[in-house]
């Protein structure tokens, strides 16, 4: 995202993206669009509607913004899936627009799958990491990789290069295939991740997350549901052993905590907007009330 200030009640965005603007299962507004929020002086966030045109150059026009000077700053979220070739932010003549530097604070680092990447929210501000960042007023680094969030040692090494205040490891949605990932392999990867992160960042909390769709009652495809439930059970068993061994500063977000139901996903796996809100709320509750991290 990009933070900026302006005294204009009209804001123009122009951008071009590198890939297809939409997917069969995800609208152009989520795949290739942007999203504008404004942060108030007391920490509250307001969303801003836009007039949108998806052509070769994508345009957004935000207008009639009530007294922009009242807001601490604006936050423009970038596309959830597409790479941006170029982007312009504009305001009418005689108004100002000032880009703000990156937040100078330790981030929350989240490593995971396409779900973390934002699939399948309808617009960028509704990806769960973006919702959580607003709720916690915290800098977030999203390391979501479609089909490739698998807790590989090489990826943990890269995650470990970032000095974070919290690490979220949400990879079970890419580890459910037992023909590729045995229970023993999942345990090996979870233990390696904990050991390596705490070796370099002692005392920093780590969250291990179950498969968000790993509970009964989400969809009628019970064959797939049982695979998701099974990998959640493996994750829970490993976490329980680690806690019993006295490993500290590790936490678990369960599928029950996330609490998906029949309205939460687009395809039985990836959350829709409802599921994204449930996901973010579950993380927020764990981080604020159990870990005690406020900002």
List where the protein language model places each region.
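Residue-level signal for threonine
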Residues: 1, 127, 152, 272
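N-terminal secretory targeting modules
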Residues: 1-107, 284, 288-295
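A structural signal for short, well-ordered beta-strand segments and their strand-loop junctions
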Residues: 13, 141-143, 208
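Residue-level signal for short, function-critical loop segments
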Residues: 19, 114, 146, 173, ...
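A generic structural signal for short coil/turn motifs at secondary-structure boundaries
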Residues: 22-24, 117-120, 176-180, 218
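Serine-esterase "nucleophile elbow" of acetyl-processing enzymes
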Residues: 67-68, 74-146, 153-163
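Alpha-helical cap/lid subdomain in secreted, periplasmic
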Residues: 153-295
